[in-house]
UniProtKB/Swiss-Prot annotation:
Record-given protein name: 33 kDa chaperonin
Job description of the protein: Redox regulated molecular chaperone. Protects both thermally unfolding and oxidatively damaged proteins from irreversible aggregation. Plays an important role in the bacterial defense system toward oxidative stress.
GO MF, any single term: unfolded protein binding
InterPro entries per UniProt: Heat_shock_Hsp33, Heat_shock_Hsp33_C, Heat_shock_Hsp33_N
Originating gene: hslO
Positions of disulphide bridges: C237-C239, C270-C273
Alphabetical GO biological process terms: protein refolding
Subcellular location: Cytoplasm
Pfam families: HSP33 (PF01430)
Stated family: Belongs to the HSP33 family.
HAMAP family on file: HslO (MF_00117)
Coiled-coil intervals: none
Taxonomic placement: Bacteria, Bacillati, Bacillota, Bacilli, Bacillales
Length: 294
């Protein structure tokens, strides 16, 4: 089965939980952007968090995550929606370091800690919610945990992980978000905290073949996990040749003529998916005529 996420409740509705397997989704991002291992881990963690946060939205609502920690990777930008679709990129995909002291990919060094995590939710009808917090670790799981507590006032635990093969392909990726509802009993909190200390890294559990449902059983085993919804997850970009053409038309006929005179063609790439669109001279002439009608 491919990538998917689950939404669930546990401990008689005191706890809301999300878990996702994103191995193929992160692999598609790696393939498109040709990211090196540390950059793959950083982008993959952000994509995984983004797709789970997207699952908290409704209808046509969308969400954008921007992570700018001042590190060599530059900015990470992720878009997601309520349908399990996510896309994203890093400014500098060719970043890699030796493993850190814990034997893991050094995401914190790549991302940096001197910056911000920003979340913008487009709730429709020009209604936007923006939350912003300083990065506290650069490892991203801790940073999203802090975001939920500080910006949305929801006590949460976020775990995201990516394992990368020696040939730069993605071996495993996934994550979880556990959130405490108002009035959660102290003994429930204690049991979850103890469980979180005992579990292996989430990427290792995914590598071992655990499903999102089984992840939640590991995290909330005695809490009576009740799955509410299962949703496929994938890397999907909304760019298209038509959208790029519209962007060229919006430049106006003079600007398009300038491109024809100087270049004789136009080429545009989408930041999010790295797809390249080519327009030859004849096509530019057509777009110029359309621009005159605007």
């Amino acid at each position: 089965m491919g990538d998917y996420l689950v939404k669930a409740l546990a401990y008689n509705g005191q706890v809301r939980a999300y878990a996702a397997r994103t191995t193929e989704t992160v692999a598609e991002a790696q393939r498109r952007h040709q990211t090196w291992p540390t950059a793959s881990a950083a982008l993959g963690r952000a994509l995984t968090a983004g797709v789970m946060m997207g699952a908290m939205l409704k209808g046509e609502e969308t969400l954008t995550i921007k992570i700018d920690g001042g590190g060599p990777i530059g900015v990470i930008l992720v878009d997601s929606n309520a349908r399990g679709e996510v896309r994203g990129y890093v400014t500098n995909p060719h970043v890699h370091f030796e493993l850190n002291e814990h034997g893991k990919l050094d995401v914190a060094r790549a991302v940096g800690k001197n910056g911000m995590l920003t979340v913008v939710k487009d709730l429709g009808l020009r209604d936007f919610f923006t939350g912003q917090v300083p990065l506290i670790s650069g490892e991203l799981g801790d940073d999203f945990t802090y975001y939920f507590a500080s910006s949305e006032q929801i006590p949460s635990s976020v775990g995201v992980g990516v394992l990368v093969n020696p040939d730069h392909t993605i071996r495993a990726a996934g994550g979880f978000i556990i959130q405490l509802m108002p009035g959660t009993e102290e003994n429930t909190i204690t049991r979850i905290e103890e469980r979180l200390k005992q579990i292996p890294p989430v990427s290792r559990m995914i590598e071992r073949g655990l499903s999102p449902e089984q992840l939640l059983e590991q995290l909330l085993g005695d809490g009576g996990v009740r799955v509410l919804e299962t949703m496929p997850v994938s890397f999907v970009c909304r760019c298209s040749r038509e959208r790029i053409a519209d962007a060229l038309i919006s430049l106006g006929p003079e600007e398009i003529q300038d491109i024809i005179d100087k270049e004789g063609q136009a080429e545009a790439s989408c930041h999010f998916c790295n797809e390249t669109y080519h327009f030859d001279k004849a096509e530019l002439e057509q777009l110029k005529q359309l621009a005159k009608k605007e």
